[in-house]
């Protein structure tokens, strides 16, 4: 199914746009420029088993100011998310693969546009955290590639070929 977001008003806006189709069903939001070694089947299974309100994928990056980032407490709970921070509190970037229950719709309706004029998914997830909802973080094992640029696509191709060659 293809659902058109009329204007680029943020990922939380995209979630609201899809709400009539999604209804009350849990769902995966997988940004198309992400590539994960091994896929997400194990994470989907964990989401179904543990039933958090949201599951987010994180990975350490050298340039966290270019991503949404997450802070975790000593018990590995999400305490704060910030979209493209000028002064990143951690190096844990949101990968762009999320699993949500219908609670994300209410959270997306409750937030206001960011300084970029968008409804940020990080703000909607933060709303869940702030209201005591369970947001489960998972650190990516294996490689992750954001393929938003040509050089990244070529690197992703090399990573996949290396994986195939190792089999």
Pin down the residues of each PLM region.
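Short, catalytically relevant binding-site loops at active-site mouths
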Residues: 62-63, 86-88, 143-145
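A short glycine-threonine-serine/GTX helix/turn-capping micro-motif
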Residues: 87-99, 112
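A short, charged helix-loop
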Residues: 73-92
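Left-handed beta-helix
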Residues: 77, 100-167
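Residues at the C-termini of beta-strands that transition into short coil/loop
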Residues: 6, 58-59, 82-85, 141
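Conserved beta-loop-beta/alpha segment of the NTase-like Rossmann-fold superfamily
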Residues: 1-74, 100, 109
